[in-house]
Amino acid sequence: VPNGVMLQHFVGWEVRAAADTFDPTKAILMDFRCDQTRGMHFIYCLPFSDQEALIESTLFSPELAPNDFYDAAITGYLKSICQLSEFEISRRESGVIPLGVLGQHDPKLAGIGANGGAIRPSSGYAFSFIHKQIDYAVSHAVNGRPLAVGVPHSGFELWMDRIFLAVLRRHPELAPD
C-alpha cells in the first residue's frame, strides 16, 4: 500500500450481555458519537440477538491508531450509548482496508480483489465487486477467450471517490455532517 493512502481500519468486539440489552431488529450504522480527533470515526452496533452484538470502531485516516484507541471507543460506546457496564467479549476482529486504486503486483497476471481494483475507494466495500470480477473472468473462460478481469468501477465513480477521500483527508471534521 503506497504511503499516504487513506485507510479504513477497525476493531470489532462480539459482546454478550444481559437479556434485553440489544434490539435485534435495529442495526446502528455509522454512529458518529465518538472521538473524531484522528479522522472520520464511527461505531457500528449490529445485534445478533437481545444479548449479543458486534460493536465495531471504524476509522478513516492515512495512519493507524493504537489498539487502545479502538478499545476505548468501544468501551465508551457500550457504557455511554448502550448504558452497559457489564459484558463479556466473546470474539475480537480487526482489519485494515486501503482506500485507493492499488497497482497490480504482476501486470502479466489478472488480479482479483484488491489487486484487481475491486475495493471501492470511498467505502472499502469489495465483496460484490469481487463477485462481478469473477463472473467476468468465468464468462471469458467459458467462451474460450483469454482470462481477463475487469475493473468494476467506472472512471467517474473513481473520480468522485478521489474527491471524497481528499475532503476526508483535509477536513475530517466535516464527515459527521
Please state what every model-predicted region is.
Residues 1-88, 97-105:
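Predominantly flavin-linked oxidoreductase catalytic cores and closely associated redox partners
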Residues 7, 121-125:
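Aromatic-anchored, charged helix-turn/loop surface patch used as a conserved interaction hotspot
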Residues 45, 50-52, 106-122:
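Short FAD-binding loop at a beta-strand-to-alpha-helix junction that anchors the flavin cofactor
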Residues 72-79, 126-145:
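An active-site-proximal "capping" alpha-helix that borders the catalytic cofactor pocket
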Residues 108, 127, 131, 149-154:
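AAA+ P-loop NTPase domains with strong preference for DNA replication initiators
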Residues 135-177:
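C-terminal helical "tail/cap" subdomain of flavin- and related membrane-associated enzymes
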